[in-house]
């Protein structure tokens, strides 16, 4: 809820004596029901790193939710191969032994990403929380390169709604972190509200569109979009934010959600 989101923000700005703590968050395992990480309020926070999962072949795990808010992917199960990790000792654990070799889900991918970030902090304890995100953007690998979800954004980075900026690369991330020069101070800008009384076409491929004018020239790290739409079946709606360069962020993708309205829902895109 709101208190948790406020705690994320405080952790980013006040943690580690002002450098900020890094919070990773699992993108979710709901792909089989057409779920999307942008519909998770905590994965949608710009103060968290949303992590999705890929198989050992670098392909999307069958359960891994996509989203415009996904920053990186990390390896997990999904193709018959699980993750080996420690377990509670004895019979009280997940298995009767002290290890398991079938850990998985984005709940496995996310701690793997956290471990990489810990190595980055060990290599350079002066990194800010934004530095960590920026380094991951620069060093993550373009896995599954033939997948059609990949696009090049206005900053020249390859990015995908399935994989974010790609599979996390521990060696590359630590190497870049070692001599990293911290980013300039963050600039926050708020625009709106933008109010438009639009009729939404039903049952066809046409779109309702309206332009948003932003006067500042900014180097954008992330965007939060608060959406308020009255609609009897929100699962019918696709919501896309398109940049002047043509980069499309699919904030909401139609699925079987039969609830009504988006009531001041905050979407995030990286």
Please tell me what each predicted stretch does.
Residues 1, 20-21, 47-48, 62, ...:
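C-terminal subdomain of the subtilisin-like protease fold in secreted/lumenal serine endopeptidases
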Residues 1-25, 32-52, 57-77, 128, ...:
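Mature extracellular/periplasmic domains of secretome proteins
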Residues 5, 9, 110, 114-118, ...:
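Predominant activation on well-ordered alpha-helical scaffold segments within soluble catalytic domains
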Residues 17-19, 79, 126, 219-221, ...:
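Short loop/turn segments at connectors of secondary-structure elements within structured domains
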Residues 27-30, 138-142, 255-257:
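Acidic, glycine-rich active-site loops and adjacent beta-strand->loop/helix elements
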Residues 28, 105-107, 164, 169:
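Residue-level detector of functionally special positions within alpha-helical transmembrane segments
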Residues 40-122, 126:
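Extracellular S/T/G-rich loop segment that most often corresponds to the catalytic His/Ser-adjacent loop
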Residues 177-270:
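Loop and turn regions of beta-sandwich accessory domains that flank beta-strands and are enriched
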């Amino acid at each position: 809820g709101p208190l948790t989101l406020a705690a994320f923000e405080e952790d980013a700005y006040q943690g580690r004596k002002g450098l900020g703590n890094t919070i990773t968050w699992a993108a979710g395992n709901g792909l089989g029901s057409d779920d999307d990480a942008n519909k998770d309020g905590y994965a949608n926070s710009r103060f968290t790193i949303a992590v999705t999962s890929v198989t050992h072949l670098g392909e999307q795990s069958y359960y891994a939710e996509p989203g415009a808010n996904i920053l990186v992917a990390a390896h997990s199960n999904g193709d018959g191969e699980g993750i080996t990790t420690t377990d509670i000792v004895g019979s009280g654990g997940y298995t009767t032994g002290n290890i398991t070799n079938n850990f998985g889900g984005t709940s496995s991918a996310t701690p793997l990403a956290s471990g990489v970030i810990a190595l980055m902090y060990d290599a350079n304890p002066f990194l800010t929380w934004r530095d960590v995100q920026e380094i991951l953007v620069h060093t993550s690998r373009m896995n599954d390169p033939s997948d059609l979800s990949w696009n090049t954004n206005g900053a020249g980075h390859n990015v995908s709604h399935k994989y974010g900026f790609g599979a996390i690369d521990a060696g590359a991330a630590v190497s870049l972190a070692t001599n990293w020069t911290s980013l300039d101070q963050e600039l926050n800008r708020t625009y709106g509200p933008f109010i438009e009384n639009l009729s939404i076409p039903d049952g066809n491929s046409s779109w309702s569109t309206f332009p948003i004018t932003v006067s500042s020239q900014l180097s954008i790290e992330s965007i939060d979009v608060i959406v308020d739409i009255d609609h009897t079946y929100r699962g019918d709606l696709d919501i896309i934010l398109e940049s002047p360069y043509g980069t499309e962020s699919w904030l909401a993708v139609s699925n079987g959600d039969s609830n009504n309205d988006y009531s001041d829902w905050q979407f995030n895109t990286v």
